[in-house]
Every structure is written in structure tokens, then in C-alpha cells.
Amino acid sequence: MHPFYQLFRNIQSLGEEEVQELLGPPEDALPLLAGEGLNHRVADALNLQLPTADLEWIHKTNVITGLYSTQTEKFNCNWKQPVFPKIHLDNNLFQKLENYFGPLTTNEKRRLKLVFPARFFPNATKYFPLLKGIKDKYPNYTIEHFFAAANYLWTLWESGILYLRKNQTTLTFRGKPYSWEHRQLEQHNGQQHKSNIRSQQISCMVANSGNLLYTHYHRDKSSNIQTRNLSDNVFKKSKESTRVRCYTYDKIQRNRLGQLARIPCESKAPSEQQQSSLRSKGRDFRNQIQAYNSSRNKGYTTWHSTTSDSIQSGSKKKTHTSNSSFERHTPSFDNEKSDRSPAGICRGTESSNHLRSSQLCLWRSFYYTKPCGTYCLHHIVSSIDDWGPCTFDGDVTIRSPRTPRRITGGIFLVDKNPYNSSESRLVVDFSQFSRGHSRVHWPKFAVPNLQTLANLLSTNLQWLSLDVSAAFYHIPVSPAAVPHFLVGSPGLERFASCMSHDASNRNNSKLQTMHHICSRHLYNTLLLLFKTYGRKLHLLAHPFIMGFRKLPMGVGLSPFLLAQFTSALTSMVRRNFPHCLAFAYMDDLVLGARSYEHLTAVYSHICSVFLDLGIHLNVEKTKWWGHTLHFMGYTINGAGVLPQDKHVHKVTTYLKSIPINQPLDYKICERLTGILNYVAPFTKCGYAALLPLYQAIASHTAFVFSSLYKNWLLSLYGELWPVARQRGVVCSVFADATPTGWGICTTCQLISGTFGFSLPIATAELIAACLARCWTGARLLGTDNSVVLSGKLTSFPWLLACVANWILRGTSFCYVPSADNPADLPSRGLLPALRPLPLLRFRPVTKRISLWAASPPVSTRRPVRVAWASPVQTCEPWIPP
């Protein structure tokens, strides 16, 4: 049926004869549909040009929101934190791939080098304060979201996906180091790397000599000269042998550790500050000793341990007898056993970081202070003696470029997808790299369009879809790019300070301003969160900064690199199994074979290979589809491609809920058009039916749905047609036109005609193509007009574009130069003798897409591997389309 049959019948301004003429033969109706007057009359009848300046716009309809309406996010207190597998691509990835799949092609090597490792060096990076690390997306659940986001980051760190910043030049992580990380290695499994031992020895000797000075100074004043000579010998370039220097270093270390056991715990923090100052070469040791003693005589204590005299005296007596932990009054907040062990002391930087974190520990400060009221956090902290460590150290420590104590993007949590609200997903806002004058121009890669999917996957095969678990986190990132991928948490103290009313005084390092965060809401929330996180609540309350070790999802570079990675894998699979079809889009991989048994054999082989390479497949999401594949929201089988039922139901629901004769703001039109566009290629009129909506969006005006236009859209979207696969055939029908006439040439006849009035050349060419399709039924036409070749009909008059899309549905075009077009003379009113037609063979459109690589034959020289006997006859291997 004609798409405008019912619509023209319902328009009263069109007479009966005019309607019959518009619905009549195409050679008479198509030029009339291109007329400007008819299009204006139909637009007026459909109320598409109603002025809406004096009417109040509607900003929400159904679940679609427009201008001035904010959609509140929903926070789920019972979100499940995802558990990430130990994702680690093998260090010998290229060698293993060659062992399994034979020598890699040039394209495969080029793509894999882009992602192993990934590099990202923008021209400019803006750093934000740590306070913006966790975004307040849920005002009613601020504290809950804060701890959930911090827990998510620590989960990623424990899985080896994030680096933990120790200082501005050091990073630590868990897992196996990659080959490029070995070059910057400082520590691995608690042992110093060879390249770092010498520098660590020098720093330890300098630090130990400073503590030795304190011992000699208090024994005898005359020993001051001896210690100064010893310190001079440490810094001078002595000409002694290596054995003597090693003996001196061991002796200093034994004296250092022996004296350390007798130093009170409260005096450790000043000694660490003295150690950092002693590392400078140009300082006088006598001044340093005097400064140390003066600070000690003043009764210097850290702010977290300022308590009553009885508690202080009791704790000091106990720390003189035990150098491992505070027994009763001091819980082991930061693993003080490891910090005070000989291995922990010699690590200079690491021990100082632990002590610095313990000094700024909010939990420790509340433990020692008196409660300020009923809802003071002291009651929660003092209920448990051992709250666990303040921070963690990873298995590996590496050097890094200068990493500031800032972040480059904020984070927040959302539902994993619209259909799964029980699990959470991390959203990282790295949008600064896509904005401003210094924005990064991301590499472009083509996404397969609908016709390409139909040409490649519309076959009668057995289908299987695979899902790569945490696909982005498979791609490692170079450590040099870490300063651009920084996320973190400001800590509970700073985060809660911003929420309190008296947060104008930000000097939170003083005891008197510590209790201003105590409130009934925070107290009750922490009690509830303790049931979820337990002792980990203390760890999550500390500030930290992390950098991505694997590829984050919030950067425009990530989709491109993931597409290169998966396309290289599918290229190798197709090359080794030419009787199968492998295709990938981002993290979704599909396999196709002619029989279920053969598909099972290929699947088991690929799973074992991917697991050995370190690629984790989500077994729960592996689906066997049979002959009907569900992929990218489409249903694909031998007949063609159709949208899935859930998308059709969504479109129908939204259209039925649209109010009539009420102006909708253009933001609602934008979102509605995005939903309708997904199903538009399967309707009779395609995208051209939405042209009135596009015009309202472009002019930033409201749009009014009339009952006629709404019912017409419902009828269009109620009848969907599949997008069929294109066939490779030889062109046998050609069309051409002039502003006043048209011509058609086939293998056996020449046809020509004239228009009643002059038309634009592009419009005339489109009408000629429509006439050729109607009269010959050919699915392949030759034309010399680039506008018709593009298939984009939205630039033509609205009525003509809708009807032309209906007539030319499923039609392909071949370009023929005007000089070689056999329909050129008939379009000018000349009918010469028939000549042989130019030989133009049409090839189905696959475009240049990065997700599909042409696979050359496998080299014969490759290692012996398991032979998979195919049930398909391989004498003439079947090549997928």
C-alpha cells in the first residue's frame, strides 16, 4: 500500500481527484510530490508549521525529559561490587599468538602494537583538587556513595587495574609486572630491584647515620666529634675498598636498629622528619642535632596522640618494652609491626609514607580524644582496637613520571545497565580531554552500518556470541601516561567538611576543628556502613590517589583501541578457520559455522587459547543462538536484519504516550528522534518521515504533534521490513535525467519521457531512478548523480523523499560516468540504436571498517598444532561473505 494512502484520504484540503492523481502512476505523481505548494498544504493540514511563540512548552513526556527538567539519579544501597578476575595479558603475547595462529600479518601486528601498551600523551592536562575526586551525584546518599566509590577503586587496585600513588615519583600495584614496567622496577615481592639497591643503600646510610648521632650525643659530649667524623666519612668520596664500606654500612645498621628499640613511639615521627632533612648534603650536623633536641625538649607530639597525661604515660611505658604495637590504648592502625621491622625501616620512603598516613589518621585522632557528644565518632572508633592498616603496599613498586597530588577526573557509580540495577558500574569523567582549545582529536574508526551487517552476517549459519569480561581492562597502559589518568578519594574528613555548615574553617589538621564533622546523620550512616565494610571502613576513610594501569572507559581513545584489539583477534581466528565466520564489535564477538558440532569444536579451541593468552571470557554471557543471531540490538538471520522486539515495543510505547496539540520543547524532540532513528531504516519511508522533527530541532523551536501525523507514524512503525543482504550482480538498467525529461536504458529497450515543469537536476535524477525501479523491477541501477548514489534522501522535498524511500527500498546503485551512461541520450529526447551496455559489476557494500580485516592465507611454515577436522568439505573451502 502507498505510504500516504490513508494520510491523503484524511486531509480535507485535498480533493478527490487530486488524491487519485497523487496516488496514481509514478510518472505523473512523483513530479507533483516534489512541488513546493503541495508540501506546504500538507504541512498546514498536519499542523507542522504552527507558530508556538505564545504557547507554554512541555518539558517532560513519559520518561523523556527536555529543557529545565533534571532527572534525579537513583542510588541503590545494595549495589553489588563487581569481582574482577586476575586480568593480565601474557608478556610474550606476540610469540604465543604466532605459536597458535601462525605468523601475524602486517595489519595484525600494527593493531596489537597500538594496545600493547596503550599510550596517551595529550598536549595539556588540567589537574583538579582531590576534593573533586568523588562526585556528589546522589545528594540523599552522599556518604554511602562516597564509601561505595572508594571501595570500587580499592577493588580495582587489588585486581591489578590501578596504580596506587605512594609519592610523586613512585607507584605501587598488585600483580605481575609487564616487560616495560621492569625497566622502572624498584621493588618486587618485598625485595629491592638490582637497579635500585645502590640508591637505597646510600639513602639508608644517610638516614641511619642521623639516628646514630642522637645516640652518641646523649652518651657523652665528647662523642660529638667522633660522630661528626663518622658522618663526614659517609658523605666524603673515600678511597677505601668496597669491603670496608660494606662493613661500615652493616655496623651502622646494627647500631641503628639496636637504638631504635629504645626510642619511644611518639618520637618516631620527628626522627623521620630529621631523616628527610639529613639527606641534604650541604647541612651542618651540629645544627640538626640542636634542632632535634630543641623540638624534643619542647614536648613535641603529633596531633593524633594528644590525650590525657595518664594515657600518654601509660602508652610510653609500654612502647619502651615493646617495639611492635600499642597494646591496649593504641590499636594497630597501620601495620606498625611491619613498619618497625628492619626491612620496613630500611625502606626510607615506604616507612615515611606509613608514618605520614598514621599521623593524619582520622580514626587514630578520634580514638585518643574525648567524645564531643552523643553522636561523636569517638564511640564508633573506640569500639574496636584493631581497625587494620591505613593503606596498603602492592607487590610491585615502580618509578613513574612526576605525579602530582591531584586528580584529572572525578568518578561516580551508576547502574550497570538499564536492565541490571543490582550491580554498579564505575563512571570516570575524563571529559577535559574532549573539550576546550587543547582537546584531543580522537582517531576515527568506522562502525559497521546496517547494510554492512546484513551483507556480512545475514547467512544461514549456526551462531554463537562471546563476551569479553571487563574488556577495557585487558589493555595495559604505559606508566608514562599515568599522570593523565588520575582518580582518587579526598578522605572522609575533607569530604564531610564540605557537607557541614561550619566548613568555612578548613584547617582540619588541628584538634579543635576535628569534631565539626560529627553529626547524627554521619554517626548513623557509619554504623550502617560498618555492617557492609567492617574494618575496611577505616581504609576507605583515608585519602588516596590512584592511576589507571589498564585502559579506562571514560576516554575517547578507549573504544578505538578496544576495536583494534578485538578485530586483530577475530582476523586471526578467520585466518585459521576459513570455513567459519568471526566478527567483533567492541567486546562482543560472534562465531558462525555451518553445523553445531563444528561450532562447538571451534569454540572450545578459542576458549583455551584466549585463557592461555590472559583474555577472560564471560561464560555466563556466552549464548548459542542457532540460526537467528541477536547482535548489536538486531535480529539477524538468512532473510535479513530486523530490530529486536524490545526496541520495537519501546518505540511504540513512546509514540503512543506523546500528547497531541501541545508544544514539546526541542530537547524532547531530540531524544525522541534518537529513539525513532534506531527503527526508522526498517519502515517504508525511513528517516525521511522524521524530517518535520529535524526542522524543529535545527531551529530550536517547539513541535506540535497533530493526530494525523501521530497516527501516520504509528502506522509506519507498526509495519517493519527487513534489510536484506545485497548480491553481487552485473548492472543491466541505467537511468538519467535532465531538468525537463528523463530516460531509461535496459538491455532490450530505451524509454524516455518529459516533466510537466522544470525540476532541479537532483530531483529529476531521483524521479528517473524511481521510474526505472518501478518499470523494470531491477535491484541494481546505474546513475551518474552522486546525490542519488549516496542514498540520503533527506535533502529532497518531504513528500517526494518519503515516497522515493518506499520505492527504492532494497535498491543498490552503481556509478557510471555521464559520457558512458547509455540513458543520457534518451533523457534528452533522443532514441538511438541499442548498443552494448557498459560492464559494471556491483560488489556488496562492506565499507572500510576496522572491525573487519581481509585475512590472507596462512603461511605453510608454522609450528605443529592441534588439527581440527571440519565436518565441512575442505577441498573447496567455503568463504564467508
UniProtKB/Swiss-Prot annotation:
Regulation: Activated by host HSP70 and HSP40 in vitro to be able to bind the epsilon loop of the pgRNA. Because deletion of the RNase H region renders the protein partly chaperone-independent, the chaperones may be needed indirectly to relieve occlusion of the RNA-binding site by this domain. Inhibited by several reverse-transcriptase inhibitors: Lamivudine, Adefovir and Entecavir.
Polar residues compositional bias, start-end: 270-279, 287-314
Keyword ATP-binding listed: no
Region (Disordered): 263-351
Molecular function terms from GO: DNA binding; DNA-directed DNA polymerase activity; metal ion binding; RNA-directed DNA polymerase activity; RNA-DNA hybrid ribonuclease activity
Region named Polymerase/reverse transcriptase domain (RT): 385-726
GO biological process: DNA replication; symbiont-mediated suppression of host innate immune response
EC number(s) on file: 2.7.7.7, 2.7.7.49, 3.1.26.4
Pfam hit, one: DNA_pol_viral_C
Site (Priming of reverse-transcription by covalently linking the first nucleotide of the (-)DNA): Y68
Spacer, as annotated region: 185-384
SUPFAM superfamilies with a match to the protein in the record: DNA/RNA polymerases
Taxonomy, superkingdom: Viruses
Binding-site list for Mg(2+): D467, D587, D588
Note on domains (UniProt): Terminal protein domain (TP) is hepadnavirus-specific. Spacer domain is highly variable and separates the TP and RT domains. Polymerase/reverse-transcriptase domain (RT) and ribonuclease H domain (RH) are similar to retrovirus reverse transcriptase/RNase H. The polymerase/reverse transcriptase (RT) and ribonuclease H (RH) domains are structured in five subdomains: finger, palm, thumb, connection and RNase H. Within the palm subdomain, the 'primer grip' region is thought to be involved in the positioning of the primer terminus for accommodating the incoming nucleotide. The RH domain stabilizes the association of RT with primer-template.
Protein family (similarity comment): Belongs to the hepadnaviridae P protein family.
Identification of the protein by name: Protein P
Gene name of the record: P
